[in-house]
């Protein structure tokens, strides 16, 4: 398969995930233009996933109905699981991709670094968040978003996408800025990792498989 043929491969996925706590549909196109439609019932999470899809230039649709009357945790984490599954499915055989991606993202006083390896070996390192994010609540027009969930989101995404993901908050104060910069950094790193390398049409591994 030539690199031109690789580039014509459709990299789309649809995941439906239903449990007693949530009902989720995720549609993802890795070669989109940043067209995003998000409805999770948690407005701040909608804002974060909109940022992720837009800054990765993925077409992303997410519809989640969860038990938000209890709290947002199940809805947020289960959606991240489904998003990771969609990412892994859309990648297909991974031929011709760059595999690695990283991004530094500032947001006012905050700076975040994210690094991705589409390795097939799921792992997540999440570090650097100030202690106050362990008990901070961001209120929206619907259900509050507890920033302690940030780590769980990225761990769930990495585990189900089968990628190595490192997210490092270098510094920051505002919980909104710190959280949003992480989503945007991950978005840009993912976008870089899944781009096709015009010099290479095979699987980017000396083992021949990822």
UniProtKB/Swiss-Prot annotation:
It is an enzyme of class 4 (lyase). Pathway: Amino-acid biosynthesis; L-histidine biosynthesis; L-histidine from 5-phospho-alpha-D-ribose 1-diphosphate: step 6/9. The keyword Cytoplasm applies. GO terms for molecular function: imidazoleglycerol-phosphate dehydratase activity. CDD domains: IGPD. It holds the Pfam family IGPD. It catalyses: D-erythro-1-(imidazol-4-yl)glycerol 3-phosphate = 3-(imidazol-4-yl)-2-oxopropyl phosphate + H2O. It is found in: Cytoplasm. Belongs to the imidazoleglycerol-phosphate dehydratase family. The gene is hisB. GO terms for biological process: L-histidine biosynthetic process. GO terms for cellular component: cytoplasm. Keywords: Amino-acid biosynthesis, Cytoplasm, Histidine biosynthesis, Lyase. Its EC number is 4.2.1.19. This is Imidazoleglycerol-phosphate dehydratase. Gene3D superfamilies: Imidazole glycerol phosphate dehydratase, domain 1.
């Amino acid at each position: 398969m030539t690199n031109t043929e690789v580039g014509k491969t459709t990299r789309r996925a649809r995941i439906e995930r239903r449990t007693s706590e949530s009902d989720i549909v995720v549609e993802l196109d890795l070669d989109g233009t940043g067209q995003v439609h998000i409805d999770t019932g948690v407005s701040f999470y909608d804002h974060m996933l909109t940022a992720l899809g837009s800054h990765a230039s993925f077409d992303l649709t997410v519809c989640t109905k969860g038990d938000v009357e209890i709290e947002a945790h199940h809805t947020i984490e289960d959606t991240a699981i489904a998003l990771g599954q969609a990412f892994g499915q859309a990648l297909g055989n991974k031929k011709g991709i760059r595999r690695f991606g990283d991004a530094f993202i500032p947001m006012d006083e905050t700076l975040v670094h994210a690094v991705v390896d589409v390795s097939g070996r799921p792992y997540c390192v999440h570090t650097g968040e100030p202690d106050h994010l362990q008990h901070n609540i961001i209120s929206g027009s619907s259900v509050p978003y507890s920033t302690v969930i940030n780590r769980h989101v990225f761990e769930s995404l990495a585990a189900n996408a089968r990628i190595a993901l490192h997210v490092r908050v270098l510094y920051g104060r505002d919980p909104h800025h710190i959280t949003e910069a992480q989503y945007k950094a991950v978005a840009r790193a993912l976008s870089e990792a899944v781009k096709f390398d015009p010099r290479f049409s095979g699987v980017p591994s000396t083992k021949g498989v990822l």
